[in-house]
């Protein structure tokens, strides 16, 4: 995918990749694919064109660099990623760690959005009044300007955000859901999940308050 300042063009590109994304998805179970399609279309048709930002920018002081100069870093956090990983149970022992394949940047739209975030951060840094107090960019540096080079920088520096969620989605069972609208696990008796894993999509917000809301509502018998 190329670089897009026009969100409608990006949206059409994302929608055109739905079939190939489903073909390359980690599970080919028909129900899971239906759920993936529903979430994908929600992302592309509602979130992408909404006033809610697709990337969060965090500006913070990072101390002195090797030359003794003070540095400022900009962190970009993708809010509604299209890439989806998979969590595997490895044994029947609840104390054994599962196998996690996050598959970050496996969807080209995520690469495009992160690349645009790098360019936008640079634009902010070269615009007054911030530009009047900033020196030279140190990472990745001005020489990294071609899209392919920016993509390589992103791939080698990306990290996970502190919002683990979405592994036990609240969706209809025929769409691969794990819990119903009352937070009960399908196929089990009176077993509920009340944590961030039931959110089917990432929020452009911190997940902890949403967990408190779920837990509070359940404690009052609303679920």
Regions found by a protein language model. Give the residues of each.
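FAD-dependent oxidoreductase catalytic-site/capping-region signature
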Residues: 2-204, 209-210, 218-223
């Amino acid at each position: 995918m190329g670089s897009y300042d026009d969100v409608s063009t990006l949206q059409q590109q994302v929608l055109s990749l739905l079939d190939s994304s489903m073909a390359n998805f980690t599970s080919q179970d028909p129900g899971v694919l239906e759920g993936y399609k529903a979430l994908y279309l929600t992302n592309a048709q509602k979130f992408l064109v909404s006033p809610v930002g697709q990337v969060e920018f965090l500006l913070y002081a990072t101390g002195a660099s090797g030359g003794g100069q003070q540095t400022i870093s900009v962190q970009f956090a993708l809010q509604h990623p299209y890439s989806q990983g998979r969590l595997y149970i490895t044994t029947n022992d609840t104390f054994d760690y599962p196998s996690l394949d996050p598959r970050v940047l496996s969807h080209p739209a995520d690469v495009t959005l992160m690349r645009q975030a790098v360019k936008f951060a640079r634009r902010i840094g070269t615009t007054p009044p911030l530009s009047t107090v900033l020196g030279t960019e140190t990472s990745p540096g001005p020489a990294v300007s071609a899209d392919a080079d920016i993509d390589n920088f992103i791939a080698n520096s990306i990290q996970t955000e502190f919002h683990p969620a979405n592994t036990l989605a609240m969706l209809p069972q025929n769409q691969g859901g794990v819990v119903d609208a009352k937070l009960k696990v399908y196929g089990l008796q009176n077993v509920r999940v009340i944590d961030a894993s039931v959110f089917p999509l990432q929020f452009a917000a911190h997940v902890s308050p949403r967990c408190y809301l779920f837990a509070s509502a359940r404690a009052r018998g609303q679920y």
